[in-house]
Amino acid sequence: MRITIASPRCYAAVGKKENQEDSLFPLKGNATADTRVFMVCDGMGGHENGEVASACVAETMGRLTAQQPLGTSSEMQNAFEKALQETYQQLDLLDKSDSIRKMGTTLTFLALCTDGVLVAHIGDSRVYQVRPEQGVVFQTRDHSLVNDLVAIGELTEEQAKTYPHRNIITRAIQPHQELPAKATFKVLTDVRKGDLFFLCSDGVIEKLEDDLCQILTEKLPLEKRLENLEQEALQRDTRDNNSAYLIEVTEVSGASMEAEIQSDSTTQQDETNPKAVDTDKKSRPNWLRWFFLLLTILALALAAFFMMKEKG
């Protein structure tokens, strides 16, 4: 499979924060139609700490994965995991004070491969695959407290949107972790001409989630669509940093029969589409449901201090 793309577009806005803690790879203005690796990182930790963490992760992960020759998604995943180990080491070297120790970042990653598109993420930054005639056909599932509570049936999708602790994430890239957070991977093989891949920090979703698909699929040049998205975020008084990459597929050649079969099924969505999460409490024994709830709360209480992202 050979995936051809238009020249990618990106933006990074500060929102209502004092400084920019999001980082992109490639840096704005450096991506071309030949670029095969993209990332958005959303730093946390306050002051300059989040900025340091996200910049370190974007630069290290980007540099090491972008030098990987064009190959399969399996080969790229191996390169990603090796790069992530090196990235943790780099963050450890930056950790020289108690305040810096609180820093961390999310990561969302996309690579164009010979057998499809490899997606990886840690935290609540997202990747969307949008098909103009169908809407969102894939999106990553946030590593967050609310999603864990939805998964065990304690919250519905609607309740999760207004839950007081919805900003707590359960995975992040941080220095000196005894058990370093691992990425969730997905290989997308149903890729078609006209598909859009959208990587973004959670600041984009803050006020625009319901209108995201409409804005991205407007019959306008790619750059204009992204400009409209940035302006909408500004007009709606988005508080958080908001940054994104938008990639449009212009041609797909040599697609496998597997991709054609998957295009007529829901297999691609089931694993990560939030709507596919089982929220039927009656389908789970009470003891098992409460066991997982208590386990989740205990684990997240220990991590919450490091994981709470500032939204002001």
Walk through the language-model features, giving the residues of each.
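PP2C/PPM-type serine/threonine phosphatase catalytic domain
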Residues: 1-312
